[in-house]
């Protein structure tokens, strides 16, 4: 006959409460980052719609306006943050995000790209 030493159930409850808080914070972070992505993409879409209305038709292949370039950069940064948080939560399929949020290819391609002068320098 094998005997098990007694164990406290209170540890299980504490771990369960901690696990619940961690999952709750992960969900809240995903929600905040998803909203930030939606906001950034909406700003880009509004700019593009206004630009088409101003120019009276479909897009013409021209160099990117600095304001639009900033909007694409903001959207790609928001996308990158959202993808990283999802991966930290164990959600690895990015294609779902791209379809659900209707992320333009140019935003996808700039995801995770940072300009050399925008990086913080660390002192050594």
Regions found by a protein language model. Give the residues of each.
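Short, charged, intrinsically disordered terminal tails
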Residues: 110-124
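Amphipathic alpha-helical segments
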Residues: 49-71
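Short, charge/polar-rich alpha-helical segments
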Residues: 17-35
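Peripheral, non-catalytic segments of secretory and membrane proteins
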Residues: 20, 54, 112-114
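Non-transmembrane amphipathic alpha-helical segments
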Residues: 33, 37-51, 79-82
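Amphipathic alpha-helical packing elements
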Residues: 65-112
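Short, charge-rich amphipathic alpha-helices with coiled-coil/heptad character
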Residues: 2-20
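Long, compositionally biased, intrinsically disordered regions
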Residues: 1-2, 31, 99
């Amino acid at each position: 006959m094998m005997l098990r030493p007694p164990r406290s159930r209170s540890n299980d409850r504490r771990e369960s409460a901690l696990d619940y808080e961690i999952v709750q914070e992960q969900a809240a972070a995903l929600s905040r980052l998803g909203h930030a992505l939606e906001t950034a993409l909406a700003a880009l879409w509004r700019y593009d719609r206004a630009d088409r209305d101003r120019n009276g038709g479909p897009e013409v292949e021209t160099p990117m306006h600095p304001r639009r370039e900033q909007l694409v950069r903001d959207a790609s940064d928001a996308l990158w943050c959202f993808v990283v948080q999802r991966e930290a939560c164990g959600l690895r399929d990015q294609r779902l995000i791209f379809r659900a949020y209707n992320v333009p290819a140019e935003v996808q391609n700039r995801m995770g790209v940072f300009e050399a002068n925008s990086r913080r320098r660390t002192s050594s």
